[in-house]
């Protein structure tokens, strides 16, 4: 959990925002997935947002659903995902690692057991996409017991009550939604979020990272100009994996070429 705090402090000192890529663990297979993650970090990722393949991904658009299917086809299990997380943490001791997932995966293991496992492998945060703030108590309590930051989604239409709850319960960072709907790079993010950012700041929320529809450097810059601490990009990255599925080396080169200008856009 402290890794987020030190990251944001360092970025602030360097006058930079955070660029955070999302990928599904095990897509398109364990070995290549680990290479992908190394490449993202080498290209300038400040933190990682990682998905665990799940059979019913509600908030995911087709691009990320396909990533899940590829990981399933490779036979990737949640247990293997945790082994991967331990390897990533060993190799990259300081980068914040977040999980973005669904409640069923937490229930399958048992809530406390799940967060204990996260702590053991070095996961810093968990966002459970299908658990609203008002039902989050057992999750966030277990998370905090195990020094894992509970992450909450702040939708564009959040009212004052919700903003206060997110500020009060969230740690690590706040996932600022560019718009409602499913994820996807086709639907470009285009909402001025200044008012939400100002409110979150007023209520001392964890730093907001803008996600959903972030696929170009100008959007990263716009998010930071609106006061966000950085931006999360998922579908655009997963699409690159899909496009080069049979050319592993080309895939890594294309990912590097995508991430470098996205990170560059965080520097004011």
UniProtKB/Swiss-Prot annotation:
Gene3D superfamilies linked: Aldolase class I
Domain of life: Bacteria
One GO cellular component, as annotated: cytosol
Known catalytic reactions: (1S,2R)-1-C-(indol-3-yl)glycerol 3-phosphate + L-serine = D-glyceraldehyde 3-phosphate + L-tryptophan + H2O
Organism: Escherichia coli O6:H1 (strain CFT073 / ATCC 700928 / UPEC)
Family that this chain belongs to: Belongs to the TrpA family.
Name of protein: Tryptophan synthase alpha chain
One example GO MF annotation: tryptophan synthase activity
Function: The alpha subunit is responsible for the aldol cleavage of indoleglycerol phosphate to indole and glyceraldehyde 3-phosphate.
Principal EC category: lyase
InterPro entries associated with the record: Aldolase_TIM, RibuloseP-bd_barrel, Trp_synthase_alpha_AS, Trp_synthase_suA
Summary of subunit composition and partner proteins: Tetramer of two alpha and two beta chains.
Active site residues per record: 49, 60
Keywords associated with the record: Amino-acid biosynthesis, Aromatic amino acid biosynthesis, Lyase, Tryptophan biosynthesis
One Pfam family recorded for the sequence: Trp_syntA
Pathway in which the depicted protein is active: Amino-acid biosynthesis; L-tryptophan biosynthesis; L-tryptophan from chorismate: step 5/5
